[in-house]
Amino acid sequence: MNIKDIGVIIAKKTLKENTFIITVFTKNHGLYSGVVKEFSKKSKFIYQEGNIIDFLWQARLHEHIGMAKCELIKSYTGYFITNKAKLYAFNSVISLIKELFHEREEHSKFFSFLINYLDNLSKNFCFRDYINFELALLAETGYKLDLTKCGVSHVTTDLIYVSPKSARALSYAVGKPYKDKLLMLPRFLLSDNSEITLEEKRQALALTNYFFNRYLFHNNRQVEARQTFIEYTLNNF
């Protein structure tokens, strides 16, 4: 059977000399892995993580790993390789997708979101965009946070906390008696114009990390590329 789609290469693993297994996040078919062969400098340039490609997958049976052929649409490597913030954010993003999405499970809307994120990242690293990516990823996997209004009083102002149980924002008045049991809601997530402090970065990463650990990172197993991004971000403010 054949599958033809557009995709982003998110992993590449050596099988033997000049032969690799690539994992591609495709628009209409989700994650697919296939064997590719590199025999030229051109093909080595095509099969790089982050490249947007035309992806052709062929196998006798659907459950087989299959062979893959790719044509390059766009490469982001040059934009990320010389900037650590961009590179670590990129590595974290593709590693999270590989870790949290199941093989051959469609995420077409999220694919478009990813392409837009990579395009913006190629121009400029923005911490707000990165956290919004993690929040979107949580939502895509079934764990959406509601930060638009208080989960109890429904007010839309003075939102300070997030409930770890309901994943909803809480106002200062509602949350104050329970503040030691609540997560902090970073101010920058409520306003596109506010500057982001180091403390708010810590709060934002703690927020998404809590829900990743609770629902998605089994046995509290962390994604190494994400940890590298966090360490770099918090130590290079």
From Swiss-Prot:
Q: Matching InterPro entries, A to Z?
A: ARFGAP/RecO (IPR037278), DNA_rep/recomb_RecO_N (IPR022572), RecO (IPR003717), RecO_C (IPR042242)
Q: Which UniProt keywords apply?
A: DNA damage, DNA recombination, DNA repair
Answer whether the UniProt record assigns the keyword Transferase to this protein.
no
Highest taxon listed in the record's lineage = Bacteria
A single GO BP term for this record reads:
double-strand break repair
User: May I have one GO cellular component term?
Assistant: bacterial nucleoid
Give the matching Gene3D superfamilies.
Answer: Recombination protein O, C-terminal domain
Tell me yes or no: is DNA damage among this UniProt entry's keywords: yes
Family, similarity comment: Belongs to the RecO family.
Explain the purpose of this protein: Involved in DNA repair and RecF pathway recombination.
Among PANTHER family, the record links this protein to: DNA REPAIR PROTEIN RECO
Q: Which NCBIfam families match?
A: reco
What is the name listed in the Swiss-Prot or TrEMBL entry for this protein?
A: DNA repair protein RecO
Organism of provenance: Rickettsia africae (strain ESF-5)
